[in-house]
UniProtKB/Swiss-Prot annotation:
Catalytic activity field: a 1,2-diacyl-sn-glycero-3-phosphocholine + H2O = a 1-acyl-sn-glycero-3-phosphocholine + a fatty acid + H(+)
Keywords in alphabetical order: Blood coagulation cascade inhibiting toxin, Disulfide bond, Hemostasis impairing toxin, Hydrolase, Lipid degradation, Lipid metabolism, Metal-binding, Platelet aggregation inhibiting toxin, Secreted, Signal, Toxin
UniProt cross-references to SUPFAM superfamilies, sorted A to Z: Phospholipase A2, PLA2 (SSF48619)
Residues reported to bind Ca(2+): Y43, G45, G47, D64
Cofactors named for this entry: Ca(2+)
EC number: 3.1.1.4
Active site: H63, D105
Tissue-wise expression: Expressed by the venom gland.
MF-aspect GO terms: calcium ion binding; calcium-dependent phospholipase A2 activity; phospholipid binding; toxin activity
UniProt source species: Craspedocephalus borneensis
Family: Belongs to the phospholipase A2 family. Group II subfamily. D49 sub-subfamily.
Cysteine-cysteine disulfides: C42-C131, C44-C60, C59-C111, C65-C138, C66-C104, C73-C97, C91-C102
The protein, known as: Acidic phospholipase A2 Tbo-E6
Length: 138
């Protein structure tokens, strides 16, 4: 019960797309994005700088780059349309910007699923100085 309360409190600050992204990660990777990816490596959860620490962190790097290419709407606040079945997510709707955000989130959720074996607890809450080297270009 305490865990549900904590999760509810965390989700109060999550708006729009970030909540949808959390749901996609749960669907595709079978785990909570907030719990597993909110403070991982140099790119998962904190914006990002430096070199991705492993394949899982690279999923977040690519996701950040994808969001950086979106124009015309706010990736972290916009609601998009999508449907899901057993093994996939399909982005829908008529708004190209919203569909682009959805595709960014979809690709990251699939990347997390495909790289579950690379997740390493040593990259959880890495010191900020680890991520101070120059970032590679998107």
């Amino acid at each position: 019960m305490r865990t549900l309360w904590i999760l509810a409190v965390l989700l109060l600050g999550v708006k729009g797309n970030l909540l949808q992204f959390e749901m996609m990660i749960n669907k595709m990777a079978g785990r909570s994005g907030i719990r597993w990816y909110s403070d991982y490596g140099c790119y998962c959860g904190k914006g990002g700088h430096g070199q991705p620490q492993d394949a899982t962190d690279r999923c977040c790097f690519v996701h950040d780059c994808c969001y950086g290419k979106v124009s015309g709407c706010d990736p972290k606040m916009a609601f998009y349309k999508y449907s899901s079945d057993k093994n996939d997510i399909v982005c829908g709707g008529n708004n190209p910007c919203l569909k682009e955000i959805c595709e960014c989130d979809r690709a990251a959720a699939i990347c997390f699923r495909d790289n579950l074996s690379t997740y390493d607890n040593k990259y959880w809450n890495v010191p900020s100085e680890t991520c101070q080297v120059e970032s590679e270009p998107c």
